[in-house]
Regions:
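Surface-exposed beta-strand edges and flanking loops
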Residues: 60-65, 90-92, 145, 164-166
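Polar low-complexity intrinsically disordered regions enriched in Ser/Thr and small residues
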Residues: 50, 69, 104, 139-144
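Small/polar-rich, solvent-exposed N-terminal microdomains that initiate assembly or binding
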Residues: 1-78
Length: 167
């Protein structure tokens, strides 16, 4: 099945795609600035990604008319900004029950958890960059929460859901 070519569409039509590219780039930048290693698999997508290896994923969840926080609660004028809801997630391998049925040692569980809390803190550091449209020029603010999911297939995922204006 051919992939649709978007190389010739208008810049306006690429607004959300450009935000997705920018969020992925800024996420990598913040982690690199703080010497926090990231998985080599890095991409953005729509919806929930499959978790089959260590990866950094930016996922498109929703877009709506209005600034961050005014999600479809009140009627909005067509001239209002648009806001996107994205999930940024990092899945990392964690210690699991061995083939012998024994749980990992407590220190190994804690060691596996350290990356998750570092990732959550880096997500909070990332917010400053996500609210900048141009260097030194701030946007309309962001709304964000970070959490950690239960393990799935030997991987644990730290995620941040963020709502930000689409410039």
């Amino acid at each position: 099945m051919p992939i649709t070519d978007v190389s010739m569409v208008s810049q306006d039509a690429l607004s959300l795609k450009n935000v997705m590219d920018d969020v992925l780039d800024k996420t990598i930048e913040v982690f690199e600035e703080n010497n926090v290693p990231l998985p080599s698999r890095r991409f953005w997508t729509v919806g929930s990604p499959a978790i089959d290896c260590e990866q950094l994923v930016v996922s498109f969840v929703q877009i709506y008319l209005g600034p961050p926080g005014d999600q479809a609660g009140l009627p909005q004028r067509c001239t209002m900004p648009r806001s996107a809801v994205l999930t940024i997630s990092i899945s990392r391998e964690i210690p699991v029950v061995g083939v012998n049925g024994r749980a990992p040692a407590g220190d190994k569980i804690q060691e596996g958890s350290e990356a998750a809390v570092v990732d959550a803190w880096m997500f909070m550091r990332l917010l400053n960059k996500l609210d900048q449209w141009e260097p030194g020029e701030f946007g309309l603010g962001v709304i964000a929460t970070a959490d950690v999911s239960g393990f799935e297939g030997g991987f644990q995922t730290t995620s941040m859901q963020v709502t930000l204006a689409v410039p």
